[in-house]
Amino acid sequence: RTEQNIIVWMDHRAIAQAERINATKHRVLDFVGGIISPEMQTPKLLWLKQHMPTTWANAGYLFDLPDFLTWRATQDATRSLCSTVCKWTYLGHEQRWDKSYFQQIGLEDVLEHDAAKIGSDVKMMGEPLGHGLTQRAASEMGLIAGTAVSVSIIDAHAGTLGTLGATGVSGEVADFNRRV
């Protein structure tokens, strides 16, 4: 089904697009370590636009997985500051997308309608979303409609948070403030 066309994180079809973006030396790249990886979203979006124009033209929203999951659960299209900064080039410290970057790389159309396709509402991880689980999502998961759902976090960051409470091999628990 075309509406479920998924490009996973490790997909490297966008190497040429990443190289083209890196050649711009745009200031946005300073916030992703100086170069963009083909595993990040803007090269993938550019690849999609160039190689699957019908899919591109028909795309409603473009999501990273954690934001898709929260949207699917709540129908709230709010994006995570974590995923948008880490993988989409959102300037979190300025709370905005850089229009000149998207224009320079040929993706200015994703900023139409207040960037609704990629995230016009970006919030901190853990903030509540919408009215919680929709009836449909709640039924599918065996939960109660309205159960709270929060803004997402990418897996690597969630894994780090999950290990902070773990004890070492010795069983000794370090002071939490020293582990953070």
Predicted regions and their residues:
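Gly/Ser/Thr-rich active-site cleft segment
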Residues: 1, 6, 10-12, 23-154
